[in-house]
Amino acid sequence: MVFRNVGRPPEEEDVEAAPEPGPSELLCPRHRCALDPKALPPGLALERTWGPAAGLEAQLAALGLGQPAGPGVKTVGGGCCPCPCPPQPPPPQPQPPAAAPQAGEDPTETSDALLVLEGLESEAESLETNSCSEEELSSPGRGGGGGGRLLLQPPGPELPPVPFPLQDLVPLGRLSRGEQQQQQQQQPPPPPPPPGPLRPLAGPSRKGSFKIRLSRLFRTKSCNGGSGGGDGTGKRPSGELAASAASLTDMGGSAGRELDAGRKPKLTRTQSAFSPVSFSPLFTGETVSLVDVDISQRGLTSPHPPTPPPPPRRSLSLLDDISGTLPTSVLVAPMGSSLQSFPLPPPPPPHAPDAFPRIAPIRAAESLHSQPPQHLQCPLYRPDSSSFAASLRELEKCGWYWGPMNWEDAEMKLKGKPDGSFLVRDSSDPRYILSLSFRSQGITHHTRMEHYRGTFSLWCHPKFEDRCQSVVEFIKRAIMHSKNGKFLYFLRSRVPGLPPTPVQLLYPVSRFSNVKSLQHLCRFRIRQLVRIDHIPDLPLPKPLISYIRKFYYYDPQEEVYLSLKEAQLISKQKQEVEPST
């Protein structure tokens, strides 16, 4: 069933009054069948042929006949049933009648329904059918939107009838929805049409649902680019058809989806603009673990580049990683040595087998067995000075170490000595352990010795070749380089503009150069065995305790000075005791 708008409403013309002929002379075959059920051809039953949709078409035809006639329009018997169709030859096939409108329906919605129903027939079928004249389009009963000719086509029993009423469709036209509703409210409602003589009977379903036929026609017209409705051909612009098709496809609901489930997704101009089209995606967005999938199995045409494998996990135990690559002697190294300096191959992850080939160092088994195992020469490893305490015990045996001494006493010891004379003493600063006093350019200089990560040097961050595990090794190396004319260290001058002072160590000042007294040797031994804070608790007279608490390096002048001072103190004490008695 198709209602087509065949042209614009022409200008109203004055028609002279004529004698009113009979209804059969004024009505076209379509309207005659709608009013008189006997006009059907013999052997054609409306109930068996057209099904439930015939009632809707008959109602629309009767509503068109029930509208009030406009000026210059012929009427049937002076009533309100216009039929401006001129007498035309009968169609090649007999047209079935249309049923009368049912009671309770609003005839104001007929114009919107007629606008929607204009797309039910294809363009090829519309050229063969007879259309109404232009006078019918000027009738106010059409709502100003143009009328149409009712064509009934025999349906097939494949698909069910229309799942939704015609009144629920979106009204189409040149105006928006709000403007059309306001225009309908302003127009007076026409009188209800009289009931028709025909009643719809149940029959087989039509061929194709209403939504499918509409979408098929609109898809064809929108792709072909139909002309506008103002050119006299009765066709609306393709933009309006596309909008109406989008509205109808959205209102199809689940019934249309179930019918089109077996069809392949077809992309049309209407669907691409208003409705989504489902494609089978190449990438579903699912993440896959790289350990479970080998990237070498991907094809060359894959849009995604191969992803590199994740870095291998290291074992928590460092000894487990290097036990198979390093000799046993390195594992028994002292605590001060750093194991991070040795390159380690990445071990495989313990949780999963190797899914990717890893680069491993090439090892020749024959060369390992043929060559004897070489001992790694670690510069930080010394078996005789593996701890700080051992290095201090080694330092006490050296004569150039003078123990606790301040810088004034050190200058007194180095006074008059040649350049290159030096001694090592305990630092008076509690932040440092040892200090170096040396003679250079006729002046005595003092500098602190740094202890950095188990090594000794004159700088806070010495170079690798300057690091020494013990003080004895450091002094011996400095003496060797000083004799060769190579100076390892230089001191910045306190006077701006002067060059730095080279540290030259050539002549150690030993504390064993002078013969020591028995008193000093006893004090030296006691200081080696007893802590300095426990000296006052020793069972000794107070003069001996005061002597032991003093510096324990040997100085003959100090011995003479102390002996004279002690003699004076003893004489004073005796003089004080005699008057008191």
UniProtKB/Swiss-Prot annotation:
Alphabetized Pfam families for the sequence: SH2, SOCS_box
Pathway: Protein modification; protein ubiquitination
Biased composition (Basic residues): 208-219
Residue ranges occupied by any SOCS box domain in the UniProt entry: 504-554
GO aspect biological process, one term: intracellular signal transduction
Membrane topology: Peripheral membrane protein
Gene3D superfamilies tied to this protein: SH2 domain
InterPro entries named among the record's database cross-references: SH2, SH2_dom_sf, SOCS7_SH2, SOCS7_SOCS, SOCS_box, SOCS_box-like_dom_sf
GO cellular component labels: Cul5-RING ubiquitin ligase complex; cytoplasm; cytosol; nucleus; plasma membrane
Composition-biased stretches (Pro residues): 89-99, 154-164, 187-198, 303-313
Residue numbers spanned by region Disordered: 1-23, 89-109, 123-272, 297-316
Family annotation (CDD domains): SH2_SOCS7 (cd10388), SOCS_SOCS7 (cd03741)
Domain SH2 stretches: 400-509
Keyword line: Cell membrane, Cytoplasm, Growth regulation, Membrane, Nucleus, SH2 domain, Signal transduction inhibitor, Ubl conjugation pathway
Tissue specificity field: Expressed in brain and leukocytes. Also in fetal lung fibroblasts and fetal brain.
Domain of life: Eukaryota
Expression induction or repression: By IL6/interleukin-6, prolactin and growth hormone.
MF annotations from Gene Ontology: phosphorylation-dependent protein binding; SH3 domain binding; signaling adaptor activity; ubiquitin-like ligase-substrate adaptor activity
Region feature (Mediates interaction with SORBS3): 124-494
UniProt subcellular location: Cytoplasm; Nucleus; Cell membrane
Primary localization class, coarse: cytoplasm
PANTHER family registered for this protein in UniProt: PHOSPHATIDYLINOSITOL 3-KINASE REGULATORY SUBUNIT (PTHR10155), SUPPRESSOR OF CYTOKINE SIGNALING 7 (PTHR10155:SF5)
Subunit structure: Substrate-recognition component of the ECS(SOCS7) complex, composed of SOCS7, CUL5, ELOB, ELOC and RNF7/RBX2. Interacts, via the third proline-rich region, with the second SH3 domain of the adapter protein NCK1. Also interacts with GRB2, INSR, PLCG1, SORBS3/vinexin, and phosphorylated STAT3 and STAT5. Interacts with SEPT6. Interacts with phosphorylated IRS4 and PIK3R1.
Written domain comment of the UniProt record: The SOCS box domain mediates the interaction with the Elongin BC complex, an adapter module in different E3 ubiquitin ligase complexes.
Task performed by this protein: Substrate-recognition component of a cullin-5-RING E3 ubiquitin-protein ligase complex (ECS complex, also named CRL5 complex), which mediates the ubiquitination and subsequent proteasomal degradation of target proteins, such as DAB1 and IRS1. Specifically recognizes and binds phosphorylated proteins via its SH2 domain, promoting their ubiquitination.
The protein's name: Suppressor of cytokine signaling 7
